[in-house]
């Protein structure tokens, strides 16, 4: 990937009086992604060029062979060598972090929420096998990241929409926690767990993963005062 484009000067917004470069708005940080690709058919929005998942491809036991086709070698040195040079160059002035996944979002997106939900009942072992494979891939990535000079790790795994999580706490503990815990236990740096949506119904379970902070506290889904009162003494709220 190209070298990060750092803080280009922007004109001041006449309405807000800001440039978009203020510390509160655009903190000095650089992200490097170490996430597995979706095993899915992808589409592109012509209006903005964004990619999105059209449909997941992990829908049966036969489809497990797609892991070998889609997932790159997590131990290949090329994944880390250039990043190490960038870290050395920028870390004195910027907070440098690595973005990973614990395996939950990869499972949801690569199966599709509809197939995921059906298979929890029709073939629960398939759901667990898919999550395990994604999580084991991330474990190997994290083992390399631990040796690098990152300031912290960012685990990006959406588990909910604005109304509720996509699984209840009992389902999360059976189908997801064992594999996400594999990754969490491997992390040797401070780390943040990210998920949009309403996490309240499963948050007690999620916190057992041992993250240092949670993000983003979506205002339309979670009341920050309630969150602070109940959990502020247990985890940093970012």
What are these regions (language model features)?
Residues 45-238:
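Active-site loop segments of alpha/beta catalytic cores
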